[in-house]
Amino acid sequence: MVSNLRLYYQIKDLIEIIKPKLLIIPFEGHAWERLIIKMVKDLNKDIKVASYQFTVTTNHQHSIFRPLKASYNPDIILTSGKITKKKFQENYKCPVKILGSNKYKKISRSKVKKQNKFLIIPEAFYSETDRLLNFTLDVAKILPDHKFIFRCHPMMKSDEFINKISLQDNVKLSNKSINDDLNICKYVVFRGSAAVFEAVSQGLKPIYLDVKNETNINPFKNIFLNSCNVIEPEDIFKILRYYESKKINKDIIDYSNNYFAEIDTKVIRSLL
């Protein structure tokens, strides 16, 4: 609450000094975002407020897709791609435009033959990183002929996990670019990370780590097949058997390719 109010007054001071025509703020469903919108509209109704959705959304997010009174709603919503544009259009009356995302990657297929390598992509939370790492180490023990590349989120300090990773010879901590990792891996193990869209677009086969009695945070939501979920380390064997005879679900590929679009700067110019 204190941080919300501090941000409120900091942005208020900047707006009074700069007097912008357009204010672009993040749109993740936080209370402070609505406070900023209300403040701007009270200060000067001629200032346009554009709210930009740039992160993954899940089935359990309500605040971001729930319109409030007009004074708390943005004048325009900018999205990362087609998927979220459609969802916002179903809920809001204001214009919704695709701005795109720096996470957008052109669809390509690596010429490097991908064999027996898993890419693990946790979110920027210690609990999620630790959970995925423990799962990875357990799976690595029962699949000694496979290699596992653990890629910490850029906001996490990977040093905290080096000692654990060093205990298992076939698990390595990534120090390469995400493109390098995507080019050499065949599978991607994930929970709520947006990087899974890039991975699937580059041909990696997705494996979701489900946790008993906890909310499902799979970014693919209802289109993801339960047959590609793992709960226990031993479940990895059924996944490998499944992918021996099955290709990635086409709905998953289409969803990945449409979640992030290329950045379109003309959208911003059109608002000025």
Language-model-derived ranges and their functions:
Residues Y92-I98, I162-L167, A194-Y259:
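Catalytic binding pocket for nucleotide-activated donors in carbohydrate/polymer assembly enzymes
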Residues N258-L272:
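C-terminal alpha-helical cap of glycosyltransferases
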Residues N183-R191:
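Acidic donor-binding loop of glycosyltransferase active sites
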Residues W32-E33, T58-Q61, T84-F88, K106-I107, ...:
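Short, charged/polar "capping" segments at the starts of alpha-helices
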Residues G100, D169-K176:
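Active-site donor-binding acidic/aromatic loop of nucleotide-activated sugar
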Residues C94-K164:
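Conserved catalytic-core segment of nucleotide-activated headgroup transferases in glycan assembly
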Residues M1-N102, V196:
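Active-site and donor-binding regions of nucleotide-sugar-utilizing enzymes
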Residues K21-I24, I76, K117, K147, ...:
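Structural motif
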